């Protein structure tokens, strides 16, 4: 046996696993009951496939025990039964398992949850397609105006383009206002790697194959019985192959592995999805606003931190960032080569039967002189087909650009341009023949398009390609550099000590630092000697800026123009980066020129509160202000600021973090208005509620009025990429709801923004919540031990899932060194989910107890204020996932005896707060139970409710064995003849972590 009987397994197991993921999972569109029926109908197939695979892959007696375990954990099995007895039966069944069978059980339940996740994704995709189809049938005459409908500003259900534009038309939003916003709109989605991305890329590939087969199986009801049987056999075969694939990473992925993983979504989905998004926008606009012109420029683009985020990740070197840029460029060039080849095949227009524009003919003559070999080869064939000839020249230039890019990747960033040895065909009469910028490529395509238009022709593939060029350019996604603020101050301290200045930088007070930095910025004298051997840290810091200059020199500024400073506290934190950038040639304050956008990241509550004062000091400085970029000559200078959800939540709890970020946005926008500066807020949202996650549509609508204005930048965490961008229609759903939310927030003045009394109420709630949270998390001396012993945090750190360490400082065990992502991951695995709700109940209770009328006020806020409704919705969703019975089992089984009394006190605090929070959330929403207002989500809750519990029991048993310091391996229990090593036990524990993450649809 591998498990001792738990000391406490009580009845409810709550609504535990329930899981609509904290991360952005698109809700099924339409009535919840309809989505629920879809799930029920299709679940039968998935469960049957799962059982078939287990019976074919496991010994008969083992397969039956696994199926029995699943049956015991189903909600329907508990109707009219004693839930305690079901829990005991689960425990007894697990007790009979040896380690090998326990590992098989963990794998089986992990597979089950991943199949259900795929099923739900398919339902979400099908629901979106159904909504698009029904939307086409329901024109505006079918929907008379409803005077009793809630104001648009308070509607937080995701809207399609068609729905939103019709609402805007009814609200008499002027076409000119909408057109102006579209011209200025700038949505940026920034993909990140994720330190707890749990699923191997190989397994992701298997999941996509299963999803594709499920789509084929279910999409066409006219398929014959034999066709369906064939597809079912393919599904069984693919799932069996998946079952025989190792779920765990065999080695720690490199940064370039992570780059490849992130770029997969561009290759497979986004490159083709973005033009579809634009077409849907144009079609919907034509129905409600036929006179509005949609600009060609991209309204939604992408960024990436994968390969460029070096904060706490020593593996991200300047060379890695350089290679990442080259890799992204090569991927785009390959796509463009393929697209141009297809266009050449299609545009067979002959000059005998069609006019051709003069500019196009003139360009062909220039191309003939530059590419005589191409002319010799193609002229005879395409003599009367100018478009094919032009595209042949275009294709040649793209291939030369590919060749140049390959040289750059191989040579590395430290090789100067003159150090490259280009092939002779790259140069003709001293002119470089490859595309030196994407503008040159776009110009060639526009020449072709303009010529076609002048003869009353259009070409949708060409329009699609031009749209892709506007969105992705040659870079695919802009790389943001991120580094922690201390790295820059440490480098300047070492530099000033070497220069033997009267006072070293590290010894200066903040006002002295600012004065010295300003003086250095305004001089043209170099500061950094070139022939000095610095410490490795300083050498790398300086090298990053030099690499950036070389990168922009070769690829243009679009590839990498943003530098994010994490843990920004003061004015000097930004000026330090500007000075280092000046030394590398990225910034010239004397000329008022900058090729780098310096972005402070304010993360802790104190820094969020301090942010307006820091930025006011900077924006009041002519030196700093002159270095802000301008989007165009007519637009104000742009300041980008990043707001950190993860660390502020870890620092002060969910409610306080969200309110401080909300308040900071208002104060920063007021400052920008006074200073005449355009503000772009960069939201560092994580996948989980404890790190700012949740439905993006609601989150964007909950932003204070006037803070979006068509500009927003948001991180898309690595762990949510598969759930949002693995399927084309899911990707379109997310992209469309992002866009409609930005449009709605920007165009519809929210008449229900917070009143002064609401602000005062929220300030009180945030303060009380923060106080209660910090009393437990930061001031309780036993909390760190509780977290380390009761959650699988140490085992999580052993998962080979990321190039980035889980802790900021190697070997450190304190809370401050632990990153926010594994902090949330640990609490999620053990079913506390504490960072996402703790402190909320105490704050709400204090308000209600002070005045009974405050409950009515809180209910009104929930109905009328999108920000408050978003908060309560997130807390409600999180509470539905908490399972304190299972969490108590973690504590009693894994906590050391000498901590028992202290841990019991901590658990009592958590349990009391949970009950209080749950009661008050239900009082505010007016619902009889959590998630009662969302039937589709509730069905998902019921589906996963207890099914995840056996994995929790298995995990505890394996962790207990693994951590038992009094029994060194090999281990042996009565009735178990096998000998186990620690590596085998660790493997089993890690598999349960995989399974629970799949069941929760969330890690950190």
Swiss-Prot record:
One of its GO terms (cellular component) is cytosol. Gene3D superfamilies: Phosphoenolpyruvate/pyruvate domain (1.20.1440.90). GO terms for molecular function: magnesium ion binding; phosphoenolpyruvate carboxylase activity. InterPro entries: PEP_COase (IPR021135), PEP_COase_bac/pln-type (IPR022805), PEP_COase_Lys_AS (IPR018129), PEPCASE_His_AS (IPR033129), Pyrv/PenolPyrv_kinase-like_dom (IPR015813). Residues 1-25 are annotated as: Disordered. GO terms for biological process: carbon fixation; oxaloacetate metabolic process; tricarboxylic acid cycle. The active site is at residues 194, 650. It catalyses: oxaloacetate + phosphate = phosphoenolpyruvate + hydrogencarbonate. Its EC number is 4.1.1.31. Keywords: Carbon dioxide fixation, Lyase, Magnesium. It is an enzyme of class 4 (lyase). Its cofactor is Mg(2+). Residues 8-19 have a biased composition (Low complexity). Belongs to the PEPCase type 1 family. Forms oxaloacetate, a four-carbon dicarboxylic acid source for the tricarboxylic acid cycle. This is Phosphoenolpyruvate carboxylase. The lineage of its organism: Bacteria, Bacillati, Cyanobacteriota, Cyanophyceae, Synechococcales.
